[in-house]
């Protein structure tokens, strides 16, 4: 255990200092049941990302159909192009529901008494790593989705076509797979700029409200501790030298940003207030020290998907750092 998570004896600025081995942490017997459950979800995450990355959309076919409304052949071509894409979008949406359940199981394990968040991380490094992997996936998914306007265009065309056919009393086969209720929920999901992050944020808020006997600090301290762990690993050369690849560096940055955003949505006053347990200036500084093209998406996530950045109580210095 000691070689997986090393707690340093020094405490600087009262923030926890750890090295959490994101590359090699393995589950203990006590973690295995939850770890297996989360692992079954995470094993599909790479194929989801590959699928989203390959998503080209049916923009040309839709334009042709709209410009030539009386050409039945072009209407059919557009419809036949869009339907398989909508099935793919449904698969992404359904994965978000699985991720939501997975996160709630993890939060249950990582926040339950009598242990503190620090003790949980010491005892359950493999679960902490899975939590990190969920955040990593989430930010990668949302980065890809934000860069792909075809998703909403395709889905809007699909919904318009379904509505038009319903008026004409036509039932299309795809409605057996994506019925009206499912389409409504998918519509709300894809309307979000960062749908997966919104899912995690809602899941965390729901977890806090459902577990009324659990102090909210148990959840927010779990998030702030994880953010501190990542920041320290990124800014300490002896830790960074332990990463075996650049991808682990990116992983660590994405996880840090992900937990900051979650903290900001769940904590009553957010991540940017003076009483926040996250060193926001330090976290932003660490990001800004990286090559700009690798962190622009992460800085944008802090700018546009946090809840409290523009509160009056947020220091001008922090706001200026994110200009």
Swiss-Prot record:
<dbReference type="GO" id="GO:0030833">
    <property type="term" value="P:regulation of actin filament polymerization"/>
</dbReference>
<keyword id="KW-0449">Lipoprotein</keyword>
<dbReference type="InterPro" id="IPR009828">
    <property type="entry name" value="CYRIA/CYRIB_Rac1-bd"/>
</dbReference>
<dbReference type="GO" id="GO:0031267">
    <property type="term" value="F:small GTPase binding"/>
</dbReference>
<dbReference type="InterPro" id="IPR039789">
    <property type="entry name" value="CYRI"/>
</dbReference>
<dbReference type="Pfam" id="PF07159">
    <property type="entry name" value="CYRIA-B_Rac1-bd"/>
</dbReference>
<comment type="similarity">
    <text>Belongs to the CYRI family.</text>
</comment>
<protein>
    <recommendedName>
        <fullName>CYFIP-related Rac1 interactor A</fullName>
    </recommendedName>
</protein>
<comment type="function">
    <text>May negatively regulate RAC1 signaling and RAC1-driven cytoskeletal remodeling. May regulate chemotaxis, cell migration and epithelial polarization by controlling the polarity, plasticity, duration and extent of protrusions.</text>
</comment>
<keyword id="KW-0472">Membrane</keyword>
<dbReference type="GO" id="GO:0016020">
    <property type="term" value="C:membrane"/>
</dbReference>
């Amino acid at each position: 255990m000691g070689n997986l998570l090393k707690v340093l004896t020094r405490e600087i600025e009262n923030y926890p200092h750890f090295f959490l081995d994101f590359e090699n942490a393995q589950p203990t017997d006590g973690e295995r049941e939850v770890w297996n459950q989360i692992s079954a979800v995470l094993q599909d995450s790479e194929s989801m990302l590959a699928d989203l990355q390959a998503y080209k959309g049916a923009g040309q076919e839709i334009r042709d159909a709209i410009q030539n409304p009386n050409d039945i052949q072009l209407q059919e071509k557009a419809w036949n192009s869009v339907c398989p894409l909508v099935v793919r979008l449904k698969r992404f949406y359904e994965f978000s529901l699985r991720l939501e359940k997975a996160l709630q199981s993890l939060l249950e394990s990582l926040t339950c008494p009598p242990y503190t968040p620090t003790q949980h991380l010491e005892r359950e490094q493999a679960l902490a790593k899975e939590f990190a992997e969920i955040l990593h996936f989430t930010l990668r998914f949302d980065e890809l989705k934000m860069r792909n306007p075809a998703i909403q265009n395709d889905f809007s065309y699909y919904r318009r076509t379904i509505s038009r056919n319903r008026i004409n009393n036509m039932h299309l086969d795809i409605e057996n797979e994506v019925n009206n209720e499912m389409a409504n929920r998918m519509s709300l999901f894809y309307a979000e700029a960062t749908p997966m992050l919104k899912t995690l944020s809602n899941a965390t808020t729901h977890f806090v409200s459902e577990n009324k006997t659990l102090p909210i600090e148990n959840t927010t301290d779990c998030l702030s501790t994880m953010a501190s762990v990542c920041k320290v690993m990124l800014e300490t050369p002896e830790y960074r030298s332990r990463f075996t690849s650049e991808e682990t560096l990116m992983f660590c940055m994405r996880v840090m940003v992900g937990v900051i955003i979650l903290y900001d949505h769940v904590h009553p006053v957010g991540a940017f207030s003076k009483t926040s347990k996250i060193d926001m200036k330090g976290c932003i500084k660490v990001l800004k020290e990286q090559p700009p093209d690798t962190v622009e998406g992460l800085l944008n996530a802090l700018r546009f998907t946090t809840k409290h950045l523009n509160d009056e109580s947020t220091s001008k210095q922090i706001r200026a750092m994110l200009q």
